[in-house]
Amino acid sequence: MCMVIFAPLFAMFAFATCGGYSGGLRLSVDCVNKTESNLSIDIAFAYPFRLQQVTFEVPTCEGKEQQKLALVGDSSSSAEFFVTVAVFAFLYSLAATVVYIFFQNKYRENNRGPLIDFIVTVVFSFLWLVGSSAWAKGLSDVKVATDPKEVLLLMSACKQPSNKCMAVHSPVMSSLNTSVVFGFLNFILWAGNIWFVFKETGWHSSGQRYLSDPMEKHSSSYNQGRYNQESYGSSGGYSQQANLGPTSDEFGQQPSGPTSFNNQI
């Protein structure tokens, strides 16, 4: 039930917070010659974070010439992989929810549904772990590449002490941090569901039968042995009691009375 409710929501939050991100930073370069200054240099970037394609122009403080620069790094592979896993997990969760609710008999027919569900759950657990870890590393690279201090180091005008370079505002990464959190939450959710899906497969029930059969055989043989011992003891006891009574052959017949007394009279 938890998978039916939380799996689609967690997957949706994961790809929405990452795939829908767009942010930016603003820098200012104050040259000695004020006419050459630019106090509002906006640098925008977004998913899939191909930062090397993000270009911007800054003053050189050496006349009207502008310097064209680009950000450093490319985290598109990890970001796209993460979003792809989230989208497919979302779609599968919705499809599985429909099957659970409306096609329960078809799901359990020939045990095919639980087996497929178990395999897919294991695969998605692994993909969530790999995708979340890769995206966490990719996000760390994005933060470094878009750090205003790092970007200012790329400008030739900022290497001259007479010019003043500063960051007006930094990019907001809260939604990207949330995407990483939801990625690992999805891994915990899917990995924790492996055991519950496994119990619905035939492998779990067959394993229990395999373990219970030897125990039943051992218990039946033990009870049979006890029954034989009790039967043997009881039969022996009765035979001994039967042999304790005297027989007519051993003691003979008792005399009926003295016959010689009648003869004397």
Curated annotation (Swiss-Prot):
Residues 26-81, 136-177 are vesicular. It holds the Pfam family MARVEL. Residues 221-230, 240-265 have a biased composition (Polar residues). Sequence repeats lie at residues 210-214, 222-226, 227-231, 232-236, 238-242. One of its GO terms (cellular component) is neuron projection. The chain crosses the membrane at residues 5-25, 82-102, 115-135, 178-198. Residues 1-4, 103-114, 199-265 are cytoplasmic. It is found in: Cytoplasmic vesicle, Secretory vesicle, Synaptic vesicle membrane; Synapse, Synaptosome. Belongs to the synaptophysin/synaptobrevin family. This is Synaptoporin. It comes from Mus musculus.
